[in-house]
């Protein structure tokens, strides 16, 4: 994949060793540490329009999720354990410790947001604040899977099918699939919101059969272990205790299932939120508005 360092001016590259393999990250800026996590079918590059603005106030760590982008791919098992959001969160905590950050702020989009809220539920003492972009909790998505929503996020069921069914089908035309997925979730319904260099980065990553397998394992974990972890928390009345911001696209995925802020109030003790004039990909479709909201939230006194 192309390096694309020019999309992250002032950032350096880090390969961070953990007990489950290396995590790739770009690190830039000075100030309190802020970890940014991407989603499917992307890499850390999706933050390129927002990270430099955040780096004016924070030390920003933009990481590839375990198995995605340039991060190592932990070997999976029948329970998809390394790709549960719980396991991913633990590995990213370890990576942050390696960088010297035991306590940090966290923002995640899509799958990265699922890792983020799981980290907040399992290890709240690690976080100062949490932001999630264009998601509802995994449990809520599955519980709200009516006809309209099942058609909109069909990939949740498709990618969760037993291996190698989705892997083999995706291998028929991976370039078409990844570009179609990106375009279909934007407000405009095309690729015009993306930097072409970023799209090429996502395309090359998705072209790797092993990376596609990891993405399927991510969704298999979401359909089984992640759902059960969420179910235990919601039934026990456990809530995210740290200050939380929920942002969603006015034309995004989360708002089409429910009113996001109402849902998150069931899951978090101190949550605020608002829509962004965007589709699903807030940091690329509406970077100024997204960056402004994140800076305001993370800069405010607790």
Swiss-Prot record:
This is Fluoroacetate dehalogenase. Belongs to the AB hydrolase superfamily. Epoxide hydrolase family. Pfam families: Abhydrolase_1. The active site is at 110 (nucleophile), 280 (proton acceptor). It is an enzyme of class 3 (hydrolase). The record marks 134 as: Important for enzyme activity. InterPro entries: AB_hydrolase_1, AB_hydrolase_fold, Epox_hydrolase-like. Changing residue 156 to H: Reduced catalytic rate. Reduced substrate affinity. Transmembrane segments: none annotated. Its EC number is 3.8.1.3. Keywords: Hydrolase. Fluoroacetate binds at residues 111, 114, 155-156, 219. Residues 32-270 form the AB hydrolase-1 domain. Catalyzes the hydrolytic defluorination of fluoroacetate to produce glycolate. Has lower activity towards chloroacetate and bromoacetate. It comes from Rhodopseudomonas palustris (strain ATCC BAA-98 / CGA009). It catalyses: a haloacetate + H2O = a halide anion + glycolate + H(+); fluoroacetate + H2O = fluoride + glycolate + H(+); chloroacetate + H2O = glycolate + chloride + H(+). One of its GO terms (molecular function) is haloacetate dehalogenase activity.
